[in-house]
C-alpha cells in the first residue's frame, strides 16, 4: 500500500484521540456499572461538585473522538481504496450527525413533546439518526470484511476488530434482549440487569479494541508527521 506524508503530526493527534476515548469509555463503563449496582459517584463529597463536569466531558469525548479517528483514517487512505474511503466517510457522517442531533435534543433546539405527543420533527430526526446508525453498522462491517480479505498486518487486525464490533452490536442490541424477554420468565428484572452489564462490558471492550487497532492502522497507512 502506498504511504502518504503529512506536515502535521496526525499520528500524534490520532494517538491522543485513541487514549482519550479509552480512558473515558472505561470511566463511562465504571459509571454505568455502579449505577446498575445501585451505587453513585455523587455519594462522594469530593465528586459531588465535579460529577456534572466529568459527565459533560465524558459525553463530548466519546462523541468527538470517533469523528477524529475515522476522519484521520479516511485521509490517510490511498486513492485506490475507494470502498474503504466511502465506508469511512459514512462513519464520519454518522458520528457528526449524531453529535449535532444530540446537542439539538440536549439544549431543546428541537421540541420533543407537544401536548403529550412526540412532535413530527423529533420523530423524523430520530428516524434519520436510527437509519444512519444502521447504515454505519453495515458500513463498518463492509469495511471490516474488506480489510480482512484484502490486507495484512495492522489493517487486517483492524478489519477483525470492526467485524467484532458488528457481532457485539448484533448480540447485545438485538439477540440478547429478545432471548432474555422470552426465556427469563419471572426473573426478567435480574436477567435484564445481568444482560445490561454483559452488554456494556462487551460493547466497551470491542470499541476500545477497534479504536486501538485503528490507531495502529493509521500508523501503517502513512508516514505521519514526516
Task: Give the ranges of each region predicted by the language model.
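Alpha-helical transmembrane segments in multipass membrane proteins, preferentially the mid-helix core
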Residues: 133-160, 209-216
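Alpha-helical transmembrane segments of multi-pass membrane proteins
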Residues: 21-39
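Alpha-helical transmembrane segments of polytopic membrane proteins
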Residues: 50-64, 123-137, 173, 192-204
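Interfacial non-cytosolic loop connecting adjacent transmembrane helices
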Residues: 35-51, 106-127, 176-198
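C-terminal transmembrane-bundle signature of multipass membrane proteins
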Residues: 27, 86, 146, 164-226
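Transmembrane alpha-helical segments of multi-pass membrane proteins
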Residues: 12-22, 82-99, 158-171
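N-terminal juxtamembrane cytosolic/stromal segments of multi-pass membrane proteins
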Residues: 1-17, 215, 219-226
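Membrane-interface helix-boundary motifs at transmembrane edges
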Residues: 74-87, 147-158, 219, 223
Amino acid at each position: 500500500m502506498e504511504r502518504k506524508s503529512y506536515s502535521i503530526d496526525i499520528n500524534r493527534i490520532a494517538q491522543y484521540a485513541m487514549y482519550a476515548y479509552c480512558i473515558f469509555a472505561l470511566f463511562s463503563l465504571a459509571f454505568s456499572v455502579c449505577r446498575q449496582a445501585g451505587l453513585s459517584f455523587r455519594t462522594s463529597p469530593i465528586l459531588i461538585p465535579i460529577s456534572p463536569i466529568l459527565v459533560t466531558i465524558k459525553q463530548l469525548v466519546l462523541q468527538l473522538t470517533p469523528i477524529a479517528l475515522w476522519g484521520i483514517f479516511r485521509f490517510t487512505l490511498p486513492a485506490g481504496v475507494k470502498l474503504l474511503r466511502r465506508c469511512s466517510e459514512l462513519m464520519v457522517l454518522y458520528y457528526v450527525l449524531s453529535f449535532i442531533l444530540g446537542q439539538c435534543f440536549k439544549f431543546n433546539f428541537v421540541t420533543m413533546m407537544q401536548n403529550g405527543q412526540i412532535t413530527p420533527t423529533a420523530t423524523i430526526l430520530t428516524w434519520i439518526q436510527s437509519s444512519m446508525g444502521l447504515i454505519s453498522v453495515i458500513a463498518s462491517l463492509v469495511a471490516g470484511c474488506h480489510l480482512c480479505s484484502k490486507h495484512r498486518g495492522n489493517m487486517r487486525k483492524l478489519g477483525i476488530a470492526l467485524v467484532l464490533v458488528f457481532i457485539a452490536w448484533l448480540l447485545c442490541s438485538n439477540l440478547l434482549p429478545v432471548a432474555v424477554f422470552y426465556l427469563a420468565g419471572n426473573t426478567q428484572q435480574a436477567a435484564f440487569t445481568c444482560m445490561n452489564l454483559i452488554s456494556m462490558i462487551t460493547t466497551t471492550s470491542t470499541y476500545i479494541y477497534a479504536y486501538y487497532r485503528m490507531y495502529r492502522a493509521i500508523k501503517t497507512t502513512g508516514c505521519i508527521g514526516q
